[in-house]
Amino acid sequence: MRFYTLLVLLLMAGGVTMQGQVRSEMYELLPESRSIKVGDVNNDGFVDVVVSRFNSPDNEVIFSIYLNDGEGHLECHENISSSKPSLHMCYEQPQLFFLLEDFDMDGNIDIASYVYADYEGMLDDTCYFRINYNNGYGRFDRFTETALILPEVIWWNNQPYYLNNPYYLGLVSGDFNGDLFPDVAVANDYHANTISALGYAYNDGTGNFDTDFLMGSLHVPVVSDLNNDSKDDIVDGANIIYSTDSLIPRYEYLHSNVYDGYSSNGMVVFDIDGDGWKDVVEGRSDYNSHLYSHLWVFKNLRDETFQKMDSVAFSMPITGYDISPNTMKLVNYNGDEHPDIIIQLGDYRIRAGYWGYYVFEGNGTFEFGSPVYFPLENETNEFVRHFDVCDLNDDGFDDLLVMHTKWTGESWLEVFMNDGYGFDAIEENDSNSTVTCSPNPANDYVYINGIEPAEVQVYNALGQVVKRVRNSNEISVDGLAEGGYLVRIADAEGRIFMEKVMVR
């Protein structure tokens, strides 16, 4: 097992500086925004953005459609209201799952979501699976609903299991029966029930669905065809839920669910070594100290078994799945042919903080090198942070889109463009850099040379901002523990320089 910390990364990297000017943009969102997805909504060849928002006073979900002008600039095109009488959604719910898929097979991306019937006073556990259909121009003029009625009891292995909570549904899409139409898998609250119900909504190709519930869960679900039988399967933590011709899923194990003090907080599935079979990378975080995480890398042995190939340990936890779905994603970070992995960092305990992103660059093998760190500090009262990645300006590199929401409801979207040097356009500095920090190591003050700083931020090994200085080239290290720190320096023109500093 290999272990990486931010300090190790800094010591290996040396000084760093920005190459050119990188554009980042900020967009104000409707209050109480909850999650974000990307897709070409209006069929113009450019990736657009969809943001979900929960309007608590009116008990409605709103989807905001942001169209891309082709250069990466976004503009709000439409707000879609999905109101329904007597809906109930918990205000503190940190995510609203939704899907972007062409459910009626007309060539246009539709929006699938769910709404709840008011639980108070209800005798059943009724939810509704809703699809807002796209007319091809980014307008959503009609919708349909399918009732998802949880059975009172599910029999499994000749044992009855009782269900009583419909909230916090998870949604994933895939072709689970091999008919080439996108289906939906939906699960009720994983935490409120000892046993949860996994429902499959099978699409007939027109957007009409038949539903069936059985035992299961969707805790950290990723959909992919793992056994090459032309039917999508679900990887859910340590479990693999294989689709079958009988439509009754078969449960196997990615690995034995060993209690090791780590919880499964993320997962990506892709063909790592190019052999035509999908492999699995699982993210696991320490839920005791909240300081460390692992990447477990598994090779698909082609017989529905997997071999653990590597374990990469690193500092800082992965954001908990209950707080932010899809905390691990595949990303084209450096423009080569190998998929990379981006991970959102932050304490999985809600309200405890977000710290930025790690990128593990793929190389076609089952070993990943030291991660690239992109710090993005926690905002005051930040409640929800979700992200997605896509190539907004069609330059061959995926950009980073981060949605923030505060407890007060204030929400905004931050876009970081990747010009080939990363989201912050940071690469290793050379010996001709004019920006330096001295003395280094330091025990009193650090002085920034070669630039007039507008703002200086000092990050510790956990990615937390521990010092902030404006309009000064003098930084006191008083109160800082001995060790390595990352100094981020911004000038008045928006250029970013980064240096490592050791404190003695």
Annotate the PLM regions.
Residues F54-D58, Y116-M122, D189-T194, S285-H290, ...:
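Short glycine/acidic-enriched loop and turn motifs that connect beta-strands
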Residues R34-N43, P94-M105, N158, Y167-F176, ...:
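Beta-propeller blade termini
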Residues V49-R53, I111-V115, V184-N188, I234-G237, ...:
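Hydrophobic beta-strand segments that make up the repeating blades of beta-propeller
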